[in-house]
From Swiss-Prot:
Transmembrane segments: none annotated. Keywords: Cytoplasm, Gluconeogenesis, Glycolysis, Isomerase. It catalyses: alpha-D-glucose 6-phosphate = beta-D-fructose 6-phosphate. The keyword Iron does not apply. The active site is at E267, H293, K406. SUPFAM superfamilies: SIS domain. InterPro entries: G6P_Isomerase (IPR001672), Phosphoglucose_isomerase_CS (IPR018189), SIS_dom_sf (IPR046348), SIS_PGI_1 (IPR035476), SIS_PGI_2 (IPR035482). It comes from Thermus thermophilus (strain ATCC 27634 / DSM 579 / HB8). The gene is pgi. GO terms for cellular component: cytosol. Belongs to the GPI family. This is Glucose-6-phosphate isomerase. HAMAP family: G6P_isomerase. GO terms for molecular function: carbohydrate derivative binding; glucose-6-phosphate isomerase activity; monosaccharide binding.
Length: 415
């Protein structure tokens, strides 16, 4: 199970009891919007969407020839799939992400791919994302040049069910198109076809992933003392005066998860609230143990302006013993131990050291890095974010602050 540890935050159980009415009201307000047009709460229902799961599997089975999968998308259209695929790719299919528009890496990729064995997936909820459409245009030209009329078999679209340029293009060309539900925003779409389609080609256990997400739904709706997302939302709410929220994951397989969380947290909660005040904390990604040799110095001796969350696996799926090496007696304390024992010791030591330094820190313990556990964790973090939106009195499901940049970009290109 996903387990919250607040041993270095004394008084939290009492705070949970004291703020119970506030949390219950936040949950009530959130759930009251469920089913309303424009509520953007459709992500709550994704773990139950068995029809989409079947559709994704049928498409995967019909295309066994794929050796390279190119996902063209940015933001929520790429961060979730990238985080999950990096953790659970068991198929040998190679994945490439065009979540940028830098020409040199794209040209390098085009020179290395075999178009006959490449599937391109263009992903955009709105269907009008500039970076996605630009990348699609480049790859479309490449596919047509190498494959002629067979190019359509090598392109699949994931977008709005009915609207937008990408949907219209897919219908005009007769392309296979998967639907992102109308009430699911990009950064909440990892368990929609945005994530499920690439994960099917990665050979991941989709049933376990969605089962874990269903468990997160169950805990979100549980009584207060059992509701993990309400508890972690309260932790962030009580520390909202600290401007920095560090999200540090002790798993190389989950190395892209912090970037996914940064978008989820920052784009959802960095807003002007209903009283006209600027609110939000800045999420900072970190990866253990690598960042013990980079950011932890700052975390230990820098400003006490942070709330840190450590995500720590409790057990490995498989392990390696560290053998004894003659001449390396300085490392004898490692001999006979396993790599996971070292990882766990470093995580626990960092957890304690940060608390000793006066930083506010808590941990989320995963049973292991499995599809079930990570599905639970990601859905948990979506609930946490939604609850915080209610506590901070902001709409966690829009992003008005990014629109001006889009307008100015178009203006420069048109000029």
């Amino acid at each position: 199970m996903l387990r919250l540890d607040t041993r270095f935050l004394p008084g939290f159980p009492e705070a949970l009891s004291r703020h119970g009415p506030l949390l219950e009201e936040a949950r009530r307000r959130l759930l009251a919007k469920r089913g309303e047009p424009g509520s953007m709460l459709g992500w709550m229902d994704l773990p139950e969407d068995t029809e989409t799961l079947r559709e994704v599997r049928r498409y995967r089975e019909a295309n066994p020839w794929v050796e390279d999968f190119v996902l063209i998308g940015i933001g929520g259209s790429a961060l979730g799939p990238k985080a999950l695929e990096a953790a659970f790719n068991e198929s040998g299919v190679r994945f490439h992400y065009l979540d940028h528009v830098e020409p040199e890496p794209i040209l390098r990729l085009l020179r290395t791919l075999d178009p006959r064995k490449t599937l391109v997936n263009a992903v955009s909820k709105s269907g009008s994302t500039a970076e996605t459409l630009a990348g699609l245009a480049v790859f479309l030209k490449w596919l047509k040049a190498h494959l002629g009329e067979d190019w359509r078999r090598h392109l699949v679209v994931t977008t709005d069910p009915k609207e937008g340029p990408l949907r219209a293009f897919a219908e005009r060309e007769g392309l296979k198109a998967f639907a992102i539900p109308k009430e699911v925003g990009g950064r909440f779409s990892a368990l929609s076809p945005v994530g499920l389609l690439p994960l099917a080609f990665a050979g991941a256990d989709l049933d376990a992933l969605l089962m874990g997400a269903r468990k997160a739904n169950e805990t979100a709706l549980a009584p207060l003392e059992e509701s993990l997302p309400l508890k972690t939302a309260l932790l962030l709410h009580l520390h909202r005066h600290l401007p920095v929220h560090v999200f540090m994951v002790y798993s190389e397989r989950l190395s892209h998860l912090p970037s996914w969380f940064v978008q989820l947290h920052d784009e959802s909660l960095g807003k002007v609230d209903r009283q006209g005040q600027r609110v939000g904390t800045t999420a900072v990604p970190a990866l253990g143990p690598k960042d013990q040799h980079a950011q932890v110095q700052l975390f230990r001796e820098g400003p006490l302006d942070k709330l840190l969350a450590l995500v720590i696996p409790e057990a490995p799926l498989e392990d390696v013993e560290i053998p004894e090496v003659e001449g390396l007696e300085a490392a004898s304390y490692l001999f006979g131990k396993t790599l996971f024992q070292l990882l766990k010791a470093e995580a626990e030591a960092t957890y304690e050291a940060l608390a000793e330094a006066g930083q506010r820190v808590y941990a989320l313990f995963l049973p292991e890095v499995s599809p079930y556990a990570v599905g639970w964790l990601m859905q948990h973090l979506m609930w946490q974010t939604a609850f915080l939106g209610e506590l901070w009195e902001v709409n966690a499901f829009d992003q008005p602050g990014v629109e001006l940049g889009k307008v100015l970009t178009r203006k420069r290109l048109a000029g």
